[in-house]
Amino acid sequence: DVAARRALAHAWLALGEAPEAAAIAQDLLSRSPVDQEAAAALATAWRLAGDARYRDLCDYAALVGVHTIDTPRGWTSLTTYLDELRGALNELHVLRAHPIEQSLRGGTQTSQNLLMADHPAVTAFFQAVEGPIRAYRQAIGQGPDLFRARNGAGHRVLGAWSVRLQPNGFHVDHIHPQGWISSACYVDVPAAIGDGEDHAG
C-alpha cells in the first residue's frame, strides 16, 4: 500500500533514521517517478544523512528563481492590475482564522480554489503568470534528475489560493503532493519588507 509506505518513510524520518526512510522513498520512486511525497522524503533523508546527492536533488541556485508577473490584457500597468487584484482577493477572505489541516498559521486563506473564481482580476492572474512559468521552464531545462525529467511539452495550473497573513503569521513546512512547480506571488507586503532594508518575513 503506497500510503502506508509513505507513512512509514515519514515515521523513519521522525525517528532520525535516514537510511531506512531513503530506501522506502527510492522504492516508491522506482514505481512512480512523479510521487512528490516520496521525492520530498528522499530529499529530507539525504539531507539528514549529509548525502551529497541532496544538493543535486535540491539545487536551489538553479531551481529557485524570482520573476515579475506580466501585466494582463485589459490593464494599463502592473501596478493598476495588482491594486485591483488585491481588492478582489480581499473580498474572498471571508474566514476569520486559518484553515485546519493546512500549513498556514496566523492568517486566513481563501476557501475556494482561485481557478474557480469569477472576478476578472482573479481570472486574469493565470494569464499574467503564463510568461514567467514558460521562462522558468526554459531556464531550468531538461535532464535526468527527478525535477527536470518532468519538464516536458506543456503545463497546467492545478490550484491556487490566496493567503493573508496577520502579524507573526507564517507557513509550516509542507509538501504540495500534486504540484510539480510551486510558487508564491506577493500581491501586497508590509512596508518593512517592501523597502528591502531588512530580512523580515
Where are these regions (language model features)?
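Short coil turns that delineate tetratricopeptide repeat
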Residues: D1, S30-V34
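Catalytic core of non-heme Fe(II) oxygenases with the double-stranded beta-helix
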Residues: P120-E130, R134-G201
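Non-heme Fe(II)/2-oxoglutarate
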Residues: D56-R148
